[in-house]
């Protein structure tokens, strides 16, 4: 095995070396394109190279100063320069090497016949400018509506933006990061009429002190506003009312002011129309930023069951919600910036559902639960951020706090036993981040500090109102977590490449108190020393890291629980650009983390019937992963293709045993090595035909996992598979008619080795939307959403939602809108799904037919 591994590593090194050496067959040429008569530089000139057969090899576009850069491959025959209003100019490669400056002559005939159209995309070196007017149609209202159409850019349901499959460095408005990682406030609130361009700066190094010294493979998004919207207040206020099962309201307000030194974005939303607003308080976390990423733990006591459904959340959420955000940024001196981001949201949700649990195995158990509850929560989350970004000094100081409360009061009918259940949670989080970078000649010094304190008090009360009560509980938990993660690193230039030496110290002090019993605390200290080497070449880079870790832990309640261990967590990342269109990424690594919940000495009830026993030590999760991605983006033809494959193999030293009977559910840890694996494959294709205004996107996802578990003392191994395909189309060529369609097909199946059984379920979702403009200011819209869900093999449940809308633009600033949703008055959602050897049948009521009338005012 070791010999095979050596051969694999040797082959990989030889392949990379050959690839790097092979770059010598290509060269670059720089020059300036000017007007032959006036000598003025020409911008946006199309510069392309071809082989002898006329096949396009590379392309570029001249910048505002007429400068261009072209890569000349070995089989390049000639280059061609074209611009509207000018005669095309073809030049051989040999001539281009002798004189790289190019002049274009005006074409008098072309000037008479030319029709001025907005170019969808302009390229200036590593900056790609998407002109919004070329992608926007009359139905787009907010920035997010157009972002989803831009080639290479993806926006998920939570508003997180990725570019070519990678998270972005920063989301800026006119060069400033007003919102930090809460930028979905801008994507969902910024009026699209105010936006001129979306700039994507590829390979952007946002830290000035590291530019030209440390490579960045991520992009920065910058929103450019129209000149009429700069340095003045603008925004939108809409208010609406209507009726369904109760009186309805919806208020949405946005105020924006973007000036050179100051930026302001204020939002206010409130509704009872099903729009849950809690996403605005969440940050989009980059999990590749290990030093600055620490997930917030979930509540241990909860009565919630099914929170995600594959239909629009507005269909089943009976809410009263409010959200307010105040974001301000101010430049301090030449290189400083101070911003404050304050978000508040509150929710009240009336919920009811029914769940049939069929726990399989050697002793099957049937549990039928019906729940009616009122869930309330609120969160206040301010952030104060100072940044100094000078050529030799970079500093970030960020203070984040969060205060929240959640309550859930309900009545549960469990196998015909009535139970009053209440949960209550109060949490506080205080977090501080410090980042500093200094350049001392050729040497770079970096310091990072992350400190977070988290405290959560939880209560669970259940009152069994039957004749023979067994579910009377009064559970109280107090969780506290303190984590401090500090690191110092220095960067040297070794053999023309970057060598980073990094030392990190992580300290954790976590504790849990159950009832008024002992406060169970555990501590751990991890020291890490990591040499990291980056080999850069003209087409990409290879990154290798070999961290050595020393972990020491101790359980306070166990006198001889001290544990020390040393381990390596190597990683490899290879990014390669075959040309300006093709890009690949390969990564592999080993992680060795703590697994499971915090250890504690006793047990608690997480709900009225589930008993959770604690771990008496820290669990360990050893994971090996391999990931590969390939991306093709052609900004001339507006075509992009992505493919990603990720595989992981995990080994844990414990896993949970689940026990179900008619009265209780129990979760007990078992100290035994267990292995699992997962495979994820994803591919997507996007194509925009700008002349006919047709946008298409197709995706295919496949997820496979193998997971062993123990249920009712019997060990099982289940193989789960999910295949999902989707196709989106939009056609907006005609000014009076637009057509949209989104279709999704899901297939899930599971194989159980113990029972030699296999289960499969299918689902299909399709949304068709039609917008008609009989006159310029009048718009009619209708949408039909059809859902076909297989609840059991060969048994299907179908839902069809039909919505209609009408809007009339009174003036440039005022618009009236009327909407009717769920015209067929669908009242119940039904779903069946498998989890391991268990089957669940779920029902939930839906919002009925509703009408809403609103008025919107732009200012």
Enumerate the predicted regions with their spans:
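Short Pro-Gly-centered beta-turn/loop motif in secreted/extracellular proteins
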Residues: 42-43, 69-77
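Outer-membrane beta-barrel translocator domains and adjoining extracellular loop/strand segments
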Residues: 211-213, 277-283, 350-366, 399, ...
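Conserved C-terminal beta-signal and adjacent last beta-strands/turns
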Residues: 724-747, 755-859
């Amino acid at each position: 095995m070791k010999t095979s591994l050596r051969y694999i590593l040797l082959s990989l090194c030889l392949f990379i070396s050959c690839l790097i050496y092979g770059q010598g067959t290509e060269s670059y040429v720089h020059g300036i394109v000017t007007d032959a008569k006036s000598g003025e530089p020409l911008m946006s000139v199309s510069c392309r190279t071809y082989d002898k057969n006329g096949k396009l090899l590379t392309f570029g576009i001249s910048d505002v100063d007429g400068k261009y850069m072209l890569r000349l491959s070995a089989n390049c025959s000639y280059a061609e320069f074209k611009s509207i209003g000018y005669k095309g100019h073809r030049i051989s490669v040999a001539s281009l090497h002798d004189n790289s400056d190019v002049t274009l002559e005006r074409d008098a005939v072309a000037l008479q016949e030319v029709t001025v159209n907005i170019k969808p995309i302009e390229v200036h070196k590593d900056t790609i400018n998407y002109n919004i007017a070329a992608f926007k149609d009359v139905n787009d209202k907010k920035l997010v509506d157009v972002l989803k159409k831009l080639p290479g850019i993806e926006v998920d349901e939570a508003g997180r933006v990725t570019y070519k499959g990678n998270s972005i460095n920063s989301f800026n408005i006119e060069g400033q990061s007003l919102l930090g990682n809460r930028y979905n406030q801008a994507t969902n609130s910024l009026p699209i009429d105010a936006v001129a361009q979306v700039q994507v700066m590829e390979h952007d190094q946002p830290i000035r002190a590291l530019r030209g010294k440390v490579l960045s493979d991520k992009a920065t998004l910058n929103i450019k506003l129209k000149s009429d919207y700069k340095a003045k207040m603008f925004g939108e206020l809409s208010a609406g009312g209507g009726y369904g099962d109760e009186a309805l309201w919806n208020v949405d307000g946005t105020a924006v002011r973007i000036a050179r030194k100051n930026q302001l974005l204020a939002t206010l939303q409130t509704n009872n129309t099903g729009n849950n607003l809690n996403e605005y308080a969440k940050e989009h976390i980059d999990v590749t930023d290990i030093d600055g990423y620490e997930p917030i733990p979930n509540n241990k006591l909860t009565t919630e069951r099914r929170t995600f459904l594959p239909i629009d959340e507005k269909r089943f959420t009976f809410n009263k919600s409010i959200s307010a955000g105040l974001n301000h940024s101010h430049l301090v001196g030449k290189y400083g910036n101070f911003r404050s981001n304050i978000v508040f949201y509150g929710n009240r949700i009336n919920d009811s559902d029914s769940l049939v649990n069929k726990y399989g195995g050697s002793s099957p158990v049937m549990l039928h639960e019906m729940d009616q509850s009122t869930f309330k929560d609120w969160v206040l989350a301010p952030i104060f951020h100072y940044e100094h970004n000078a050529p030799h000094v970079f500093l970030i100081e960020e203070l984040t706090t969060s205060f929240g409360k959640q309550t859930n009061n309900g009545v549960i009918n469990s196998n015909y036993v009535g139970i009053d259940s209440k949960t209550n949670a109060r949490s506080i989080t205080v977090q501080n981040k410090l980042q500093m970078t200094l350049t001392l000649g050729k040497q770079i010094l970096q310091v990072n500090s992350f400190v977070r304190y988290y405290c959560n008090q939880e209560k669970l009360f259940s009152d069994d109102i039957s004749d023979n009560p067994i579910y009377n509980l009064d559970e109280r938990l107090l969780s506290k977590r303190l984590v401090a993660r500090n690191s110092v690193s220095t960067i040297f230039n070794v053999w023309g490449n970057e060598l980073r030496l990094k030392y990190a110290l992580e300290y954790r002090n976590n504790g849990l108190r159950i009832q008024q019993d002992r406060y169970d605390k555990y501590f751990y200290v991890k020291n890490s020393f990591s040499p990291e080497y980056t080999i850069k070449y003209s087409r990409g880079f290879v990154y290798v890291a070999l961290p050595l870790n020393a972990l020491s832990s101790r359980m306070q309640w166990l006198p001889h629980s001290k544990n020390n261990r040393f381990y390596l967590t190597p990683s490899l990342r290879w990014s390669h650009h075959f040309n300006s269109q093709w890009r690949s990424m390969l990564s592999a690594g080993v992680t060795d983390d703590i697994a499971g919940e915090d250890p504690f000495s006793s047990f608690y009830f997480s709900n009225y019937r589930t008993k959770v026993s604690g771990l008496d030590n820290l669990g360990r999760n050893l994971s090996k992963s391999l990931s590969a991605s390939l991306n093709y983006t052609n900004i001339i033809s507006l075509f992009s293709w992505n493919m990603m494959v990720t595989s992981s193999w995990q080994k844990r030293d414990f896993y949970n045993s689940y026990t179900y009977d008619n009265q209780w559910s129990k979760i007990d840890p078992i100290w035994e090595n267990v292995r699992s694996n997962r495979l994820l494959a994803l591919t997507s294709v996007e194509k925009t035909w700008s002349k006919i205004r047709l946008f298409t996107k197709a995706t295919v996802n496949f997820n496979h996992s193998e997971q062993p578990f123990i249920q009712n003392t019997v060990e099982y191994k289940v193989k789960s598979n999910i295949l999902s395909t989707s196709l989106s189309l939009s056609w907006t060529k005609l000014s009076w008619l637009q057509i949209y369609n989104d279709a999704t097909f899901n297939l899930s199946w599971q194989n159980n080795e113990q029972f030699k059984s296999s289960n499969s379920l299918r689902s299909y979702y399709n949304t068709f939307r039609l917008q008609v403009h009989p006159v310029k200011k009048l718009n009619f819209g209708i949408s039909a959403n059809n859902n076909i869900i297989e609840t059991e093999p060969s048994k299907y449940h179908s839902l069809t939602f039909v919505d209609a809308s009408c809007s009339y633009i009174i003036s440039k600033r005022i618009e009236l809108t009327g909407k009717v949703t769920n015209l067929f008055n669908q009242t119940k959602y039904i779903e069946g799904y498998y989890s391991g050897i268990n089957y669940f049948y779920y029902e939930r009521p839906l919002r009925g037919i509703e009408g809403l009338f609103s008025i919107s005012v732009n200012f």
